[in-house]
Regions:
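Active-site-proximal loop/turn and secondary-structure-junction residues that shape catalytic pockets
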Residues: 108-110, 140-142, 166-168, 204-208, ...
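Acidic (Asp/Glu)-rich catalytic clusters
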Residues: 92-97, 124-129, 147-157, 188-195, ...
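Surface-exposed cleft-lining segments at the edges of enzyme active sites
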Residues: 135, 169-177, 204-212, 252-253
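Core AdoMet radical
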Residues: 70-88, 96-116, 127-143, 157-184, ...
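Distinct, well-ordered alpha-helical segments
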Residues: 114-122, 144-153, 212
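Auxiliary Fe-S-binding modules of radical SAM enzymes
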Residues: 1-34, 38-40, 44-45, 226, ...
């Protein structure tokens, strides 16, 4: 493993000031309109292929400055006006086909009062309670009775998505998330105790890991999450794009994972959950997948295979050996 070849302290913990100083500018946004929304198919916990409406809500920037995060580019510097979040939900629902589930992703923490005003919870609930599942994202340290109160009012299945990223303790500390693996575990126990489903985000090859170690720790991390009762695991190939990641790339501390690693981790993960946690779903994120191609001839076929595995939750036939040498 890359870190084992160096002084443990050589991988620096990022601090807010360094991360902020490296940033490019933000995008200009309207607080009354979500900055993006889409409907896509996802394998449900029942095993059906369902349509899911995902809203990327415009709101105040998250107070956590995670090293790898670029979601702040589509956030505001101030709290949204009361009524803005319900209006954003209306805007998206009116412009999309029907869906069974809804994700309210806000580039931060749903239960942060400065991001999503609690005064709007009632109006939000009125708009989403007809969905079978309502999925929000939240930091472990903000996961408490607020989520239970929201669930009680909601009257449908609530699911909270938490970014674990990795169980590697030094790498997690270097991501500036201000959390530990135990913080994550406690949050999962709390949510499951209150009949709130949990999904988690994991990074494939965060800064500080080489290709082999990136694969290994992604697999270890997904096993850890599944063993804690997480019902849905989303693997995110780590990307540049926020300033500090480019600096780490220049310093040799970070490089994108390969699409072959994306395939391998998804394969190994699906095999593990099939044997040990058959109700756990596992997805590999394919946003900007073209940037992970190292061969334009077999890259698209590998992306298509990953998408098929995302939808089927089964290991699909391998891509034939390519002229590039990868099989």
């Amino acid at each position: 493993m890359f870190l084992e070849k160096r002084d443990e302290m050589a991988w620096p913990k990022m601090i807010d000031q360094e991360i902020l100083a490296a940033r490019p500018g933000k995008n200009r946004l309207d607080p009354w309109i979500p900055y993006a929304f889409l409907v896509e198919s996802e394998r449900s916990r029942r095993g059906t292929l369902d349509e899911v409406l995902t809203l990327f809500l415009t709101n105040q920037e998250c107070s956590f400055r995670c090293t790898m995060c670029d979601l702040w580019r589509n956030t505001l510097d101030q709290r949204v006006p009361l009524g803005a979040i319900p209006a954003q939900i209306d805007f998206a629902i009116e412009r999309t086909p029907p869906a069974r589930h809804i994700k309210l992703y806000n580039a931060g923490n749903f239960f942060d009062a400065q991001a999503i005003p609690p005064e709007d919870h009632g109006q939000i609930i009125a708009r989403v309670r007809s969905f079978e599942t309502v999925i929000v994202e939240n930091h472990p340290r903000l996961t408490d009775e607020r989520s239970v109160r929201f669930r009680d009012q909601l009257g449908t299945q609530l699911e909270v998505a938490i970014g674990l990223e990795t169980i590697h303790p030094e790498i997690l500390a270097g991501l500036n998330k201000r959390m530990t693996v135990e913080d994550f575990d406690q949050s999962v126990r709390f949510l499951l105790k209150h009949q709130i489903d949990v999904r988690t985000f994991l990074l494939l090859k965060p800064p500080g890991l080489d290709e082999a170690s990136g694969r290994e720790w992604a697999l270890r991390s997904l096993k850890h999450a599944a063993e804690r009762g997480v019902g849905c695991i989303s693997l995110i190939p780590t990307r540049p794009g926020n300033g500090i990641m480019e600096q780490l790339q220049t310093q040799g501390e970070f490089s994108r994972p390969t699409i072959q690693s994306m395939e391998w981790v998804l394969e190994q993960g699906l095999e593990f959950v099939r044997k040990h946690h058959p109700t756990t779903r596992l997805f590999m994120d394919l946003w900007d997948v073209e940037s992970f191609y190292d061969c334009l001839q077999c890259g698209p076929a590998r992306a298509e295979r990953i998408q098929k595995m995302n939808l089927s939750q089964q290991i699909e036939p391998a891509v034939p050996t390519c002229v590039c040498g990868h099989s």
